[in-house]
């Protein structure tokens, strides 16, 4: 079979619950990589996916992170950004995150030297800082002073802002109303008490389409597996699309995983 792309759309925080049997997944990934390119897609940031890849002992896997805002090419360690948040949007999002006593974790690149994949954070609560690190299997130093956080933000072009565990009600309807004006951003509840804000130019599907072109392939060459993540649009344009949910209310259940992967493997070999 000609070379294809196998795309796994995944949320690391619930992967181990939904995966059920890691040995089955590792066997599938290893077989898929014999002839095809493996890419992980996620609403999380790149380092969290890389940590998961290390746990799975997987190499040569590209990553589309931050719901499509950034693509990381493993062999060259290069980052490709789809779009950045504008200043008006950043001010609105940060303001609402602060007044609701939320944890704030941002990703972007340096305005000074274009260094990619840099973060800045602000957690008023030490407990939220610890909870965030524990949930997302990441490590970083807590920025204690808000002024220092703002200075760090001023040095970055932001691709995404994560708002974690608001203590007070965050009026998303009001934020959406603001977003229809000058600010141009979108948000998603990609995990309980976790909001992701990106430019409204960013979508997973657009990032995946752009990625396929870098591989000399087309969307019809993509086999897509969605494991309990926010769905991509236009999945009917792909070679195949499988949706696996932890609950029984939609799509396939975790009990179907071995059979699904076996059938997909047969298509790829």
UniProtKB/Swiss-Prot annotation:
Keyword Nucleotide-binding belongs to the record: yes
Residues at which ATP binds: 103-110
Protein name: Uncharacterized protein MG374 homolog
NCBIfam families: MPN552
Keywords, comma-separated and alphabetical: ATP-binding, Nucleotide-binding
GO MF term list: ATP binding
Origin superkingdom: Bacteria
